[in-house]
């Protein structure tokens, strides 16, 4: 039966973040992806507003596409590649939170989780990729970064590149009943959320330690990109601030809430650590004025500008980037410790 555009937009508006419109169009992989990410954090759901007509047209000519499936290679998509990277890291982070207690987790559990996240995005729409090669790339990469939470980044990169290299159109399959499709989606959803919910509810402190370690590794990678680092910190702290704004201090038990406050403090402390490192780069002490910072910046830039150090170009470029990054950090006004509590209670 032909799919209607009006019905698709209605389902998109009513249950878009849960993937109802994709379920209606027979895009089960896309529906599962939206279920597990709440519509790609909301951004993917909003962006789809302009894509729904093409999704409906694709669903209505699905039979013709099946007949021509397997012929040729789908065009390379930068958006799909980036989405594979992000979802792969997201699956890896969830695995770190919920399954890191397992033996050989970094050899089996982590690459499997990241690889499945990459494959889920690869299977969106009328495309798919090779399961063995994609998971193989993930498993081969994981031992190189064994025991490090940051391993989810190179594993996701390797799996995404492999998935793009082996991309192809989906083969022809027979139609399935809605109950079978819902059963499969339900099992996949429970497999993803079950361990996570158990870990969060029963092992809060341990869960937070893994989250903190992982966030620390990620944020440290952006120490030379202050603007991007601050954006990531704001995104990470947004759920906490929203929860505080909605329920205050009485939404959950104080002992439980204190555990999550520790995570907030952990992420928030990166501003102080980055400022101390920036002061070391400038050779200044705490309490330096803006005039002193600006003057020292001009001196260091003049000394280490690559054009003035042609015989040690590599060292000059490295120091020049350090100086620029440190200056961006020191330019930002510093909030006193604990000011975030006052900001939230002032509401």
Swiss-Prot record:
Pfam families: DnaJ, TM2
Segments passing through the bilayer: 5-25, 32-52, 81-101, 105-125, 135-155, 186-206, 218-238
Source superkingdom: Eukaryota
GO cellular component, as recorded: membrane
Keyword Chaperone: yes
UniProt-listed CDD domains: DnaJ
Keywords of the record: Chaperone, Membrane, Transmembrane, Transmembrane helix
Domain TM2 stretches: 4-50
Function, in words: May function as a co-chaperone.
Protein name as catalogued: DnaJ homolog subfamily C member 22
Organism field: Bos taurus (Bovine)
Native organism taxonomy: Eukaryota, Metazoa, Chordata, Craniata, Vertebrata
């Amino acid at each position: 039966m032909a799919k209607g555009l009006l019905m698709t937009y209605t389902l998109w508006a009513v249950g878009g973040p849960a993937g109802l419109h994709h379920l209606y169009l027979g895009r089960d992989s896309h529906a599962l992806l939206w279920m597990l990410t709440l519509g790609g954090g909301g951004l993917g759901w909003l962006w789809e507003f302009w894509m729904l007509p093409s999704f409906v047209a694709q669903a209505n000519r699905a039979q013709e596409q099946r007949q021509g499936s397997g012929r040729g290679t789908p065009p390379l998509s930068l958006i799909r590649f980036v989405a594979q990277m992000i979802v792969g890291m997201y699956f890896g982070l969830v695995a770190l939170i919920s399954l890191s207690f397992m033996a050989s987790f970094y050899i089996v559990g982590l690459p499997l989780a990241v690889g499945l996240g990459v494959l889920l995005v690869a299977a969106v729409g009328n495309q798919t990729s090779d399961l063995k090669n994609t998971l193989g790339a993930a498993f081969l990469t994981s031992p190189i970064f064994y025991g490090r939470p940051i391993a989810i980044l190179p594993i996701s990169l390797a799996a995404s590149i492999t998935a793009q290299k082996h991309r192809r159109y989906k083969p022809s399959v027979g139609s399935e009943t809605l109950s079978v499709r819902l059963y499969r989606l339900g099992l996949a959803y429970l497999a993803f959320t079950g361990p996570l919910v158990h870990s969060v509810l029963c092992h809060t402190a341990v869960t937070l330690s893994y989250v903190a370690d992982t966030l620390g590794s990620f944020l440290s990678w952006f120490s030379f990109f202050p603007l991007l680092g601050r954006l990531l910190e704001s995104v990470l702290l947004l759920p906490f601030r929203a929860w505080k704004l909605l329920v205050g201090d009485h939404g959950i038990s104080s002992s439980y809430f204190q555990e999550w406050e520790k995570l907030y403090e952990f992420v928030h402390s990166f501003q102080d650590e980055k400022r101390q490192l920036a002061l070391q780069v400038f050779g200044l002490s705490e309490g330096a004025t803006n005039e002193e910072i600006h003057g020292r910046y001009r001196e260091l830039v003049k000394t280490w500008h690559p054009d003035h150090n042609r015989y040690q170009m590599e060292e000059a470029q490295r120091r020049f980037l350090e100086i620029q990054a440190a200056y961006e950090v020191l330019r930002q006004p510093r909030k006193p410790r604990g000011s975030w509590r006052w900001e939230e209670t002032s509401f």
